[in-house]
Amino acid sequence: MSHHVPNLYGTPIRDPHEHKRNSASMGEVNQSVSSRNCERGSEKGTKQRKKASRACDQCRRKRIKCRFDKHTGVCQGCLEVGEKCQFIRVPLKRGPAKKRASVVSNEKFSSDNDPLQYRPRTHSYPMNSGNNYLPSLARNSSFPSISSLFVPSITAQSQQFVKVPYDDIKRRSSLATLGSDSSISTEFGGNYRLDENLNVRQEGKDIVAKGMITPVEEMGACSSNVRRQGSQSLPIQEQRASPYINPFISGKSRLSSLSYTSEATTSEGNTQGKTQCMLTPNSVRSIEKERLNSLTAGCPNKKLGTDGRSDKWDKNSTWKPVYRSSNPSHPSTEKNVSLNQEASAKPLMLGTYRQFDAISFYKVLGIYYNFFHINFPVIPINKSKFTDMLDPEKPNVIDEIRQINNEIIQCFKTALEVLVFCKIKQRRSSKSTKSWSHDNLCDFQKGLYYIQNFNKCIADCFQSLITIKPVLKQNSSVIPSRIKFIYFSTIIVLNFILILAGEESSLLLGPSVGVFNEFQAHKLFLPFENTSSMLLLNSNEESGDEILDYAVLFKRLYILLNILDTLQSFRLGQPKLINLNFGSAIETYFSDKTGHNQVVEKAPVALDNILRNLKLGEFITYFVLNRKSLQVNVPHHLLFTNQTDYGEFAVEKGEHDNIAGKFETLLKKKKILIRKLLNIEQKNDHILENCCNSDAEMKNIGELVCSMITLVSGILDSITNMNAENSVDLDSKPLPNAYFAQDSEEELMSPTQSITSNLASEENTRCTTKDLMGTVSIFMLPMVEECYNIISLIGPIPTTLISLYIRNGNMAKGINDRIMTLSTALNELVQITALFNTLEPFRKNAHDRAKRYYVSATSSTGCYESVMKSMYSGKCAASNASNVAPSEEENKKILKKFADIGWKLMDDSELGCCCCFFN
């Protein structure tokens, strides 16, 4: 016989044994219209409560006492501010976890029988649901619980106090404990199983694994739970607090940062008239999260259609927010759009309106042309022409070609999004008004996904391109050249991303060169009369009533790939994969002489900076191809002769006004200094016999070293003023409103174009540091590494020369001037040290390499063993001076020390600026 004891609110309490029988369902709770009790199934007896079992969300957030009134249904604190009492927050469990009897069936777990669902503890991001061709890159990953992905729709007036299903949501330190064979049942009829490659396979009918959800409702509940989630996401918050969480800091540390890989999942619910959505990432800090919720609270939902025939590239790369609603006017099963209708219609990325819940492709493209293109044109064509290429509505294109076109465009968009999103600068302070995360929550979530799954996104996108390659090659005669141009541009973008990130392996560079060679891109530079028969070319196509010379465009792509190969060879000291001598290719194929139609950039200021950076890459290519290490059997007398002919790279007027010109001059002077220091070792006895020769050599070396220190100081100062973090900074160079309005092509003009339209003369066409503020340069990392190595090697020379002059006691007028010059160089060394500390992303890498440099390159006696010196040890032995006076003995040691510095500089030039030396 069950006894009912009235509680504080006058409602009967069920027998505990009866409650145990009814609580077998995981989400089942007592539903009574007037019940506001907090039952505990484990208690044997029940006594009346004198106060509310817990504070409401509003009082708990304000940390005040909750005085709940059962008659009004509102506590005193909420009544004063005019808000409603809500008890949506799920409190943390106390005590050990209790065992559950069994897993409840999906039929009983529905929103009709159980309106109290769970508060999500995790977040989710989309990933590829197909096969992983490179599973090793996504090895470190885990998945959140599928049953905790959706925000419930709870009416606060119906129930003020709910029984929290503690046993269903267990506190775990890591989500990686889920086994690969564990099956997860969901409340919406879907069944998920994690396979060996950590992919989520969809088995339910109503599950649509297409994209990411932007929360638009229950914002108060989201913000009230931020403080509780802060303790669970502390490691991720510490990463978000630093602006250097992106994968462009270190190639090795990035592999360990792939903590999880998950898939955004949406499904059709049973709640009428409510839109359910996923939570924001736990890594968002509380104040930032509240701002994002307020930004997205008033936006209407937009139903985006999905294509059932979309291939794995849709799931791999670009995904759009998909909402689920139980409104009968929007059925859950939509008809699939045919390929012909999809190809004939203009794609979503090129729409004429801007959607709030999906990033505009024009915005991504605009960020590239404003922050990347001005320094290195990965897409070697101006924006208006390239946008026209992306339009699939072209004449004489069959349906199969449209399908290939759409797939290639999807791969290109994925590569461009990875480049842009991973280089967006995340703000420490919440006062920033133009930060990427404050503009759109969906954009921020997508960027966080790309950062956490950097290598996997790159590998999947490149694997998709390799899969398309046989079809592209087999149908090369009927596929338009513009589609091939987008295909090879995507390959260049992927290699650009890895080199920009400082990747120390040729993961994609070798296969990319193979793809270009397979399509015979190198034959475009040969004087063939009939070029239309080549695989890359069909015939010139009309684009916007103008003719594009695709032969020039493909030549540009091959030259860009050659420069990327050069940068890897320059940094790592490895042989080049492309050894063609293009001559003056930059002036021939990239300048405005090629015609206004296929010009790289219409703005004169941006075009001038592009040409300067590409000429720097051309010079570094010439610098790498003339390495002595590639000529091991060269006669010893040729080692010290001036073989390098820099006549083609003469210093132009105003060259030192930009970073590229300064770095090119630094490399030239470094080559001259190496030759002078190595000549000292050969003429040691002759120099010591004549004091005048000794003074002349010291003077030349001192002046050359001081000028190099000044150049390094200027380079680092320009980099610091331009973009010390080498990331996209929307505060320093904000995008115009034209990228959001998208009304006309004139409005899409870049800021540099609008600036140059007001210039009165050609003298102002030079690109200044102000024009480059906030832009990203691929040359920045090699520059900083090379400057660090040079300063580390030649830094002791000014101090040594000053001590030598003072010890000799010759304080003539010329000597005093030399000492003043050397003292100025010492002051600049102090400033250079401070500048290196400012360049935080590069400073860590530089210090690590310097440690390897000095530890692994020293012998057991602690002396430096030069690799190049050991190669030429029998060819360039130093002469021994006879009858050397005691006063000249110190000079001899100094000269020998300078010769060792020359060998070290030669090792740096020959073996790479970030290589590891071995004994």
From Swiss-Prot:
DNA-binding region in chain numbering: 56-85
InterPro entries in alphabetical order: Carb_Metab_Trans_Reg, Zn2-C6_fun-type_DNA-bd_sf, Zn2Cys6_DnaBD
S-S bridge residues: none
GO molecular function: DNA binding; DNA-binding transcription factor activity, RNA polymerase II-specific; zinc ion binding
Record keywords: DNA-binding, Metal-binding, Nucleus, Transcription, Transcription regulation, Zinc
Alphabetical list of SUPFAM superfamilies matching this protein: Zn2/Cys6 DNA-binding domain (SSF57701)
Localization: Nucleus
Start-end of Polar residues biased regions: 23-36, 318-338
Coiled-coil zones: none
Region annotated Disordered, chain positions: 1-54, 297-338
GO CC terms: nucleus
Biased composition regions of type Basic and acidic residues, renumbered to the chain: 37-46, 304-317
CDD domains in alphabetical order: GAL4 (cd00067)
Description of how the protein assembles with itself and partners: Binds DNA in a sequence-specific manner.
Listed PANTHER family: GLUCOSE TRANSPORT TRANSCRIPTION REGULATOR RGT1-RELATED, GLUCOSE TRANSPORT TRANSCRIPTION REGULATOR RGT1-RELATED-RELATED
Name of the protein in its database record: Transcriptional regulatory protein EDS1
